[in-house]
Amino acid sequence: MAIAAELERRGHEVTINLPQIFEETVKPYGFKYVLQQFDDIGVMIDSAAQNSHKFRPFLKWMRNVIDKQFDQLIPLLQEHDILVSTNSEFAVASIAEYCKKPLIRTAYAPFLPGKKIPPAVLPFPKPNPIITPAILWKLMNRMTNFMVKDTINKNRAKYGLAPIRNFGYHAGERSYNYLLFSQHLGNIDPDWTFKWSIGGYCFNDTFQYDEKAYEEMISFVDSAQSPIIFFTLGSCSSKDGNRFSKALVDICKKHDYRLIIDSGWAKTGITLQADKHLFLMKQPVPHNLIFPHCDGVIHHGGCGTTHSVGRAGKPQLITPLIIDQPYWSYRIHQLGVGPEGLKIAKASEQEIERKVGD
């Protein structure tokens, strides 16, 4: 939505195709939008974080999404001049090719095959001299081809397009790859062979929020002078989130810190009793209005939260769960702006306390 707002500010006409869970969020912006016709992403994000889903249902869901994207996006794109998409939308390169329209493919981590940086979607962000990034990318491409290539080629045949041989390289070659992260927080591979540029993160400072919720948070901030820690899992969830929250509360009481918990989509920590040490944020408030008041932030490691904490100049501890979050955890520790990441499911209260001290 931040990208759409900026494009409209520059005079472009924008239509957003978005998951159903964001309908109420997008309405205040006044954008023209079309809801996706396939199963909502929210359930899959939740089950991925919980490690509760099986591979076959996920694979079936993904292939169904590809079929529905061909059905819905082709007539939409034919009415527009350019397609802007994330790199995780597997059908878009073929859709843009069929419609003969340019594709800008965005990414929130270095998701381009290369020789120096491992695939950010794998939980092995540190380059290994034996199992090299190039080897991991080959494995990644084989896995992606297994998941999506046949479904994509089935739809390409339906629309008279030749089959693809390798999804990763086809998508990279048929698009302009625009990296939506900071070159100072993330890293790049100068040897990438695809068309790409890096533009930094697009912060959504126009985020619509509840003024009363913000004022309640500020009242908590102003109520004392003791240090404030902020904890959020963003749009993710973890079955250990409530245990982790309780441990943070106990640590803050022990050291006379204060804690703000953003309950988020999963209502993390919602059963805890608020007091002078704890504020439960039940309504979303923009990061740029929160983080300047905090002394440290503990979070899941999403690209947006990582960049927002970095912009506020605050130390951060990442508890990575899925996708690119281990990559951002690795980068934050590598850059020295936060301690080594913490696995939320395995961390003891003593280990959490040590990390908070760091």
Residue map of PLM features:
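Conserved nucleotide-sugar phosphate-binding/catalytic loop shared by glycosyltransferases and other
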Residues: 15-57, 126, 131-132
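Conserved nucleotide-sugar donor-interacting segment of glycosyltransferase catalytic cores
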Residues: 64-133, 184-186
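Donor-nucleotide binding loops and adjacent catalytic segments primarily
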Residues: 181-296
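A donor-sugar binding/catalytic signature common to diverse glycosyltransferases
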Residues: 1-2, 82-85, 282-331
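Alpha-helical membrane-targeting segments
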Residues: 55-59, 116-158
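Long, low-complexity segments enriched in small/aliphatic residues
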Residues: 148-199, 207
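A short, Lys/Arg-enriched amphipathic alpha-helix followed by its capping loop at the start of a domain
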Residues: 3-12, 25, 250-255
